[in-house]
Amino acid sequence: MNLEIKHAILVLWIFLQVQGIKDTSTKTHSSGTKNIDKAPRIETTESTSAVHKASTMKRLFAVAKLRNKRSALFPAVNICPRESLRQILESLQEYYRLRVCQEIVWEAYRIFLDRVPDTEEYQDWVSLCQKETFCLFDIGKNFSNSQEHLDLLQQRIFQRSFSGRKDDMSPIEILGVPTTAPVLPIDVSSMSLRPFPLPPDDTDLKEVTIKDIQTPIAIRRAELESKPEPTHVTEISSEEKVEFSISLPNHRFKAELTNSRSPYYQELVGQSQLQLQKIFKKLPGFGEIRVLGFRPKKEEDGSSSTEIQLMAIFKRDHAESKGPESDLLSLDSNKIERERIHHGAIEDKQPEAYLTAADLKKLIIRLLDGDQPLVGGTVPFSDEVTEPLFRPVTQSELPKPLTDVTEDVTLSPELPFSEPRLESVDIYGPYLPDSSWSRPVTASTSGVGNLPSFTPSIFALDDQSSPPLMATGPTAFIPTLTLPISDYSTVRQWPLEVSHWPESSSDRELSTTSSHDTIRDLDEMDVSDTPALSEIAELSGYDSAPDRFLEMTTPIPTLQYVTXSSETIAAKGHELVVFFSLRVANMPFSYDLFNKSSLEYQALEQRFTDLLVPYLRSNLTGFKQLEILSFRNGSVIVNSKVRFAKAVPYNLTQAVRGVLEDLRSTAAQELNLEIESYSLDIEPADQADPCKFLDCGKFAQCIKNELTEEAECRCRQGHESHGTLEYQELNLCPPGKTCEASQGQATPCRPPDHSTNQARQPSVKKLQRQQNKVVKKRNSELSATDFEELDDQDWEGN
């Protein structure tokens, strides 16, 4: 009972408290209303600006309530509530690196390359930046040193007009018209017509020194001074001509240089054009370079030198052709002339290019040293000149007329096309005595017949009196042919690998320097002149038994080259030899190219010789000979061999590859020859197998001499040659002939195109007498189909 009373009292008390609070709030509201009514009214003259300001703030706060708030601490980063503080910080740092790297890479492409990057390359650079592979500023250095950036700068220097500098110059500086002769001397100390060295990056600015230039030079495209002042706009030309001169301080001026027909003049012109074309072709629009003449020059020390006057012609498209037809920019490498500006109707329309001393210096340095290194590596040529820069041409080196042919012969056919066999190569030693043949001598020209003009496939830079490069140990020589070629030719001398055979039209006796007064003609030779097979079996790489061969793989070459980045040295007593092959994709192959005596082979051989020899000679120090070994099918594959000195001041393989890559681009532009880059196969002799570049056919096998490292073709079992005495004991098939299948007995080697090119085959009297009528009839009736079927049967039987 008491508990219920207490509970009722508590409820009543709570009710009274709540009721009292309501009464108090009502009184307060009433008093506030009364006070407001008693207060004075706000005057209408008060400024309305405060009211407008308050309303604006209210609107801003209202709009802010509708906007999504951005986190001030974690922008664009999703924070998981379960992450720790350390994980949150790592996420922020990773996002920071991503955004910074994206901006850096994007700006690098925009500033240095002026283009939008591809997606893959952009992601690659961002990934490298995030992994801290490159420092932030190293990325900019990498882009600024890239070849694409340097090419872009080079194009802008030649194509962009620096018109913004015109207002900063005085009229005298812009016009560049002094009171005396308008010449500013510039000393280019290292400019010469030897192969230009590619110096290291830290020394390239020392190559060219520019003096006496204090103000910017405005080089203007003006008209030729020989033409009168123009009064109207002439036709727009597609060419722009640049005249300049080069000083040769160590080359004295000679009287022969005043006669443009003299051999010395022609040689110097050719060397100058070859050197400068390689450098100027890097400039956009370069067309050709012409030698205008030579003149003497006196140096500061009183010595005499030669100055070459040249003209470079650049081709322009119609968008860039804004100057008159006779636009000529006179740029002298030792003298930069400020040309007179013709005042006329076209003065305001001529584009101008203002170059400061720094711009001009960089331009000349880049022109001399070259921006792009050779593909496959830079060729580090030596700065020292061990020989005279230009050697006067002697009478013996001048091209000879066609009547100076020393022997009336033709070339034998080439071996048939077949893939080279590398798996089985035999090695043999010297196998012919010294008395077999004598060295070739010059015979009378009275019996010379009409021969097609062609050039042999070996060219050398040495004097004709020097010993033959291929003569090592006891060798045999065949009378050869001396033909009119350029100044780098010598008499062609072959050891065993002979491609020239005497004609059978008449018997000839040749005078020799040996103990014999005369040499017996081929028809008077006997088998006793040749050593028996048993006498040389110990030195040869195959068994003397006639029923089988000693097959062996190619051993490790004993010839080893010392190759470094700056030099290549051959073994003692040897020369540096490089084999290379290249493929011309847009040239159809003809089976006449298997026959070295065919006119098509000779013409193509001459074409590639004229193309390759000048490049190799002018760019590779120590170059001696180029020998075109053969042409193979596959469009046209050219197999060649190059001989050098015993030591050269550069990496031989990289240098040859670089020159051939450079030749490939030149041939594609000027000669329309598509030489495929991936087809270039370059191997030094100490690493290469010479049989790889020699085709012997299905019935022959390649063998290699241990001493001379030369490759030969030898008939396989059942296809031995019995028709030529000099090869019958050794089972060797002469170059240009193939081993022929036979039934029951071996038959002589025959040219690969016996049925179609019989008129051009070399014939020897001895072969004609030894071949009886039965053999001739069998050979003539042997068709191509029977030949192939019998070929396969014999091959399977072996």
From Swiss-Prot:
Post-translational modification: Highly glycosylated (N- and O-linked carbohydrates and sialic acid).
Keyword match Glycoprotein: yes
Principal localisation: other
Source superkingdom: Eukaryota
A GO BP annotation: extracellular matrix organization
InterPro entries listed in its UniProt record: IMPG (IPR039861), SEA_dom (IPR000082), SEA_dom_sf (IPR036364)
Sugar-modified residues: 142, 442, 445, 595, 619, 633, 651
Sequence ranges assigned to domain SEA in this UniProt record: 238-360, 574-687
Keywords from the UniProt entry: Cell projection, Extracellular matrix, Glycoprotein, Heparin-binding, Hyaluronic acid, Receptor, Repeat, Secreted, Sialic acid, Signal
Record region (Disordered): 741-798
GO cellular component: extracellular region; interphotoreceptor matrix; photoreceptor inner segment; photoreceptor outer segment
Motif (Heparin- and hyaluronan-binding): 624-632
Transmembrane segments: none
Secretion signal, residue range per the UniProt entry: 1-20
Subcellular location: Cell projection, Cilium, Photoreceptor outer segment; Secreted, Extracellular space, Extracellular matrix, Interphotoreceptor matrix; Photoreceptor inner segment
One GO MF term attached to the UniProt entry: hyaluronic acid binding
Stretches with biased composition (Acidic residues): 786-798
Pfam families registered for this protein in UniProt: SEA (PF01390)
Role this protein plays: Chondroitin sulfate-, heparin- and hyaluronan-binding protein. May serve to form a basic macromolecular scaffold comprising the insoluble interphotoreceptor matrix.
PANTHER family, A to Z: INTERPHOTORECEPTOR MATRIX PROTEOGLYCAN, INTERPHOTORECEPTOR MATRIX PROTEOGLYCAN 1
Protein name: Interphotoreceptor matrix proteoglycan 1
UniProt organism field: Rattus norvegicus
Gene behind the chain: Impg1
